[in-house]
């Protein structure tokens, strides 16, 4: 192989290897769940579900640290949420990590009125009060 072919091959390998984004690290780190419970399907639960979806969809595109609130309708309490991703991961990996943490937050904390779950590359929190 000529020296120019070797150089071209090396450049292609570097571009391909450098361009391949590593998946988000979704290893469980910690969780904290409020002992007070809410009813699934209640107005607050629906606000909470909307807040979590908002966090999942938008955190990667709003500085990797995003807070939201979903105002209760008909007197239901407002749901407050926050999500954070490590700055070192891609936007798609941030969204993927938050999808993972959103599933886990329900699995770990069930119907808790407030919860926090930390994975290696992302974090999510929700409460019935502002923070």
UniProtKB/Swiss-Prot annotation:
Disulfide bonds join 33-109, 85-94, 97-122. It comes from Picea sitchensis (Sitka spruce). InterPro entries: Cell2Cell_Antifungal, GNK2, GNK2_sf. Gene3D superfamilies: Gnk2 domain, C-X8-C-X2-C motif. Alpha-D-mannopyranose binds at residues 34, 116, 127. This is Antifungal protein ginkbilobin-like protein 2. It comes from the Eukaryota. Residues 1-23 form the signal peptide. PROSITE patterns: GNK2. Keywords: Antibiotic, Antimicrobial, Disulfide bond, Fungicide, Lectin, Mannose-binding, Plant defense, Signal. Exerts antifungal activity through its carbohydrate-binding specificity. GO terms for biological process: defense response to bacterium; defense response to fungus; killing of cells of another organism. It holds the Pfam family Stress-antifung. PANTHER family: ANTIFUNGAL PROTEIN GINKBILOBIN-2-LIKE (PTHR32080), GNK2-HOMOLOGOUS DOMAIN-CONTAINING PROTEIN (PTHR32080:SF54). GO terms for molecular function: D-mannose binding. Residues 26-131 form the Gnk2-homologous domain.
């Amino acid at each position: 192989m000529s020296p120019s072919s070797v150089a071209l091959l090396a450049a292609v390998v570097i571009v391909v290897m450098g361009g391949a984004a590593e998946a988000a690290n979704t290893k469980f780190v910690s969780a904290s769940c409020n002992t007070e419970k809410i009813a699934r399907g209640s107005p607050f639960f629906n606000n909470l579900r909307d807040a979590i979806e908002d966090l999942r969809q938008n955190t990667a595109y709003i500085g990797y640290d995003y807070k939201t609130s979903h105002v209760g309708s008909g007197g239901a309490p407002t749901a407050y949420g926050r999500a954070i991703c490590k700055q070192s991961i891609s936007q798609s990996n941030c969204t993927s990590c938050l999808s993972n943490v959103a599933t886990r937050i329900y699995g770990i904390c069930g119907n808790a009125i407030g919860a926090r779950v930390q994975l290696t590359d992302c974090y999510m929190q929700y409460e019935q009060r502002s923070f």
